[in-house]
Amino acid sequence: MTHGRVNPDFRLEDQGITGLGTVYYNLIEPDLIQYALARGEGSLGKGGSFLVTTGKFTGRSPKDKHVVKTDSVADTIWWENNREMSPEGFDQLYTDMLAHMEGRDYFVEDLTGGSDPKHAINVRMVTELAWHGLFIRHMLRRPDREDLDDFIADFTVINCPSFQADPAKHNCRSETVIAMNFDKKLILIGGTEYAGENKKSVFTLLNYLLPEKGVMPMHCSANHAVGNPVDTAVFFGLSGTGKTTLSADPARTLIGDDEHGWSDTGTFNFEGGCYAKTISLNPEAEPEIYATTEKFGTVIENMVYDAETKDLDFEDDSLTANMRCAYPLHYISNASQAARGGHPKNIIMLTCDAFGVLPPISRLTPAQAMYHFLSGFTSKVAGTERGVTEPEPTFSTCFGAPFMPRRPEVYGNLLREKIATHGATCWLVNTGWTGGAYGTGSRMPIKATRGLLTAALDGSLADAEFRKDPNFGFQVPVDVTGVPGILLDPRRTWDDAEAYDRQAAKLVKMFSDNFEQYLPFIDEDVRAAAIS
């Protein structure tokens, strides 16, 4: 039995998926919420939001992501970073997952990834949970209803949380599995209810496909000046570094908060919504994001709330520090409906420095920008991955290693070409610690970060006096209006300057040791920009 609107020539049966219970195609938000409530998947929150918990999986499982190793991708996948799965293991996984799905009801959403029609892909999302359908309707882009009659997916994603993989049988690591088969244009997800796996699977897919078209896929947020898409800025960074918060600037138009492409015509969002962290969310500092938590259809994931009043507790991280809300882009009043911008005028690389060494903002040369892009230094922030309970310094190349199927140089060279062709001023912004390392120092004040970014984006920072950092070689402003001068010189924020020097030397060595892996693949100017 089927319900909903679908291309009559492209039902699940036409894809060889049969024997299911009722299949619900392309239900809209009210219907998905009704089914989710009736099935006991969650509770209704204030304003019609949907409150849900995801069990033991409250973050991504990057170690359980696999790519099927076939002849077509054997030479293009970065296997040191992507776990391989045999074609035979995948086929058995698919067979067993379909057998597990028999007789169960499923929800199908036909959506697109990419706001630029020239580079968009059609994605069919098949979900066991109704609220996952709601989530992915927010995250990807919705075709017009009449276009569903002719919709044919380029790739299909099947998410079955109740299915558990068998490592010996399916050639995977654990009972949780995310398996991508580029030949069969199929992604299988099992053993986890964490909704972020859905969107990141599509992101990984686009990260593989788009470089062949000369498009730079980016783990970044983006905005542009009001009424002036030419003045576009992108914000690279891992989860928890401030991409969503800092790009949601009321003085600028939001393009998107997490995943974008940079083509020959400019910047475009892959998604149709936002997936914001809500821990310590403040209505004064982030009023737009805070307001979405009481809007109809917003998915509130893994937040503690009062059972009687449905009031959310933004400070209680007993379920996870990775509490989130997912909502459509149009819930942000200053969001771009086209979700597109020009070529980036400013490129901001966000890092959460748990060592407390890096200044709050630094200007980079193009060679330094490629160096820091390939390095991807930051700290894993609590909760974004399973097992991370406090910040851990790490190097995540391209500011998103878990989502990069190709070698880092592919993305680094694309970025370098785009900067050379279109020009951009590049900045490294530390949203991490100041006055000491994690545990002794304090988090960089968001007011100061916003002030520095405003000065960078409006061009006034370019006129400031800069000094060369003795440890890292980049340019650091000496004085910026509205920002305490002591913040601009990290060494001065420490009580013990010699302790800072030791910490800085430690971080410099970490950078140097990490970058050795890229030396054979880079040009001399980038090698010269390397920290040593």
Swiss-Prot record:
Substrate binds at R60, Y194, K200, R324. GO terms for cellular component: cytosol. It is found in: Cytoplasm. Its main location: cytoplasm. Its EC number is 4.1.1.49. InterPro entries: PEP_carboxykinase_ATP, PEP_carboxykinase_C, PEP_carboxykinase_N. One of its GO terms (molecular function) is phosphoenolpyruvate carboxykinase (ATP) activity. One of its GO terms (biological process) is gluconeogenesis. It comes from the Bacteria. It is an enzyme of class 4 (lyase). It catalyses: oxaloacetate + ATP = phosphoenolpyruvate + ADP + CO2. Keywords: ATP-binding, Cytoplasm, Decarboxylase, Gluconeogenesis, Lyase, Manganese, Metal-binding, Nucleotide-binding. Mn(2+) binds at K200, H219, D258. Binds 1 Mn(2+) ion per subunit. ATP binds at K200, H219, G237, L238, S239, G240, T241, G242, K243, T244, T245, E286, R324, T449. Pathway: Carbohydrate biosynthesis; gluconeogenesis. Its cofactor is Mn(2+). PANTHER family: PHOSPHOENOLPYRUVATE CARBOXYKINASE (ATP), PHOSPHOENOLPYRUVATE CARBOXYKINASE ATP. Involved in the gluconeogenesis. Catalyzes the conversion of oxaloacetate (OAA) to phosphoenolpyruvate (PEP) through direct phosphoryl transfer between the nucleoside triphosphate and OAA. Belongs to the phosphoenolpyruvate carboxykinase (ATP) family. This is Phosphoenolpyruvate carboxykinase (ATP).
